[in-house]
Amino acid sequence: FKSIINYFPLEYKKILPDGKRLGIKISYIEQDKPRGLPDAFILGEKFIGKNNVSLILGDNFFYGQYLSERLKDSVKLSKGAKVFLHRVSHPERYGVAKVKNNKITIIKEKPKKYISDLAITGLYFFDNKVVEFAKKLKPSKRGELEIVDLLNKYKKVNKLSADYIGRGG
């Protein structure tokens, strides 16, 4: 299983140079300019290989009851993608997901009209088809590949699931 951390790569390199002290191997690939989160998968194609992968946004802190167990379960994901959601007061500030009968029915980035109060946290797990799906994305109006568009590709083929992060405790 591989992980991609997308944000502040130089700071991470200083703190965790190669991972040897932790008994793991860490590799770094940097985007030369902002092209969106899914671009990390395209850049990391050789690194990912046939492995499943996680994407962790490095400017977030994740905690919550039973989070370790949920992460261990998520690493076992064999097909599809999983996002972690958290209830928020101002969903218009986040990418959000609407869930019905344990299925994600809508994913939207910073919706102007209320859809749901379940924010996408920046903690994702993907099968190795993520590179293939990312390569098929078209840049948004911002000129970047959007994570919401990638998640919608998985939703379209019925391979997107969600888990929840509650308050710590």
State what each model feature region is:
Residues 1-57, 62-69:
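Conserved N-terminal catalytic core of the sugar/cofactor nucleotidyltransferase
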Residues 7, 99, 125-126:
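A conserved hydrophobic position in a structured secondary element of the catalytic/binding core
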Residues 17-23, 98-99, 153-155:
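Short, conserved catalytic or adaptor-binding loops enriched in Gly and charged residues
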Residues 23-25, 49-52, 77-81, 93-94, ...:
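Short coil/turn connectors at secondary-structure junctions
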Residues 54, 68, 72-75, 103-169:
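Catalytic-core segments of class I nucleotidyltransferases/pyrophosphorylases
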Residues 57-58, 84, 126-127:
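A secondary-structure boundary/capping signal
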Residues 64-92:
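Conserved donor-nucleotide/metal-binding helix-loop-beta segment in metal-dependent transferases, i.e.
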Residues 89-93, 98-102, 110:
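Ligand/cofactor pocket segment of small-molecule handling proteins
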